[in-house]
């Protein structure tokens, strides 16, 4: 399944700390006809999933529980097995994969019907609506896939992610909780209902 969304407010949030030349290059790359493409992957797309997931673990290891060392050791069958209980979305811009997440259908905390995880957007494309486009895809397919009420966990120190989730309709649910995978760290549940 492929769904395209026009890139709205594409110049908002352009790499706040980048040089004027880097900003200009990014603006030129994201010409007026740019669109974000959201793909629902199949097991045959395992290599595409592996590539973006390992990029995410290298770029932002602090955002995830699993490590690059753990996941880089998975073979093809290990990656394919992930599709047995989870759906994977990838957001692409100009044929470059720039964002990802997974959705697991379950009856979770706070009345959720599914759990979102592994959310990541390439830092060069944050603020361009990649994550928002993936959640719009979720909204369009929420009834048929059982994705009506989404839940997720976010590290409490990751205020940028918390603000991004709030901007697309998530709200805090419950109290912060201690992590079992990262002693001394805390995470917060957030929930959102599809529109």
Set out the residue ranges of the language-model regions.
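Conserved N-terminal entry element of GNAT/NAT acetyltransferase domains
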Residues: 7-44, 51, 55, 193-195
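Conserved Rossmann-like nucleotide-binding pocket used by diverse enzymes
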Residues: 37, 115-117, 150
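Acetyl-CoA-dependent GNAT
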Residues: 43-51, 55-124, 135-137, 141, ...
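Conserved glycine-rich acetyl-CoA-binding loop
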Residues: 109, 118, 122-136, 143-145, ...
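C-terminal "cap" of GNAT-fold acetyltransferases
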Residues: 148, 155-162, 167-168, 174-195
